[in-house]
């Protein structure tokens, strides 16, 4: 089934946390399974940084980003639950973002797109569910950037969600991770084609975006995985200053592939939203915000995650416990590193099933 779309805030504007408003917001979303009569089996899936509204394709015509986790009888069981997943505000996969047409100018927003944070993304998701007449969620689940969204749901709408499942995401982004994001942003901003973000009528900043993606890929993997996959193997035809080693060729391929599916401005906005995430924003303190959580909270850490470091997840665990949150915590090692939440089904299956069944 094709992605569904709806336009909200066609009359009153949507007010953003850092100032400014948006109107006529288009939201791309997809649903799976059937909502029961009591409306007690709805689960919101929150995608990661560069994800989209289609984690799964029921006909297997394509491979969704959570294809191995979803389906009848799997951890995210489409025969038992009703799933909703929407593209985030600021994205480029159908929901209003910098590449969308600004209704005031009839041109892409570009540099005029307002600054957004996770709280705005979550507020728009709540508006979508209200439109779909879904008052309450059995669970909100997400990995990485999606885990931040899941956390904020439990804080901003404590009476609307029973379970939170946060995979590979801390409450606050670490300094090193912010540093990585800064370098990635600078690669894009300093591309000659960036033009301050107004590049839609000319060549986009492809070189900068490809470089940014290559760096990002290194934070999603582990040195062990890269060593197993490539070691020091070289290409059959080497380029002394280019793709000499196979690992270099892999990164170049990933950078080029990314250009076909993502917008540079969206990348910048979402990276900054990741950096700025603070669950306590607009509350008296972080602890006061966490104390609002009524949902059962499952937190899963990957010990060798290169992006969301184990120390940051352990700090999050401590903060949640001190705030009285009903917490279930797991940590494990995976060759996949941060990307384990996308591919390591063997480990995550039982944890997700237990969380959705309200069991330890």
UniProtKB/Swiss-Prot annotation:
Compartment(s) of residence: Cytoplasm
Keywords: Acyltransferase, Amino-acid biosynthesis, Cytoplasm, Methionine biosynthesis, Transferase
GO CC annotations, alphabetized: cytoplasm
EC number: 2.3.1.31
Chief localization: cytoplasm
GO biological process terms, semicolon-separated: homoserine metabolic process; methionine biosynthetic process
Annotated InterPro entries: AB_hydrolase_1 (IPR000073), AB_hydrolase_fold (IPR029058), HAT_MetX-like (IPR008220)
Positions of substrate binding: 213, 339
SUPFAM superfamilies: alpha/beta-Hydrolases
Signal peptide region: none
Domain of life: Bacteria
Ranges of residues in domain AB hydrolase-1: 41-344
Example of a GO MF term: homoserine O-acetyltransferase activity
The reaction(s) this protein catalyses: L-homoserine + acetyl-CoA = O-acetyl-L-homoserine + CoA
Pathway(s): Amino-acid biosynthesis; L-methionine biosynthesis via de novo pathway; O-acetyl-L-homoserine from L-homoserine: step 1/1
Active site feature: 144, 305, 338
Function: Transfers an acetyl group from acetyl-CoA to L-homoserine, forming acetyl-L-homoserine.
Family, as annotated: Belongs to the AB hydrolase superfamily. MetX family.
Quaternary structure and interacting proteins, as annotated: Homodimer.
Name of the protein: Homoserine O-acetyltransferase
Species of origin: Pasteurella multocida (strain Pm70)
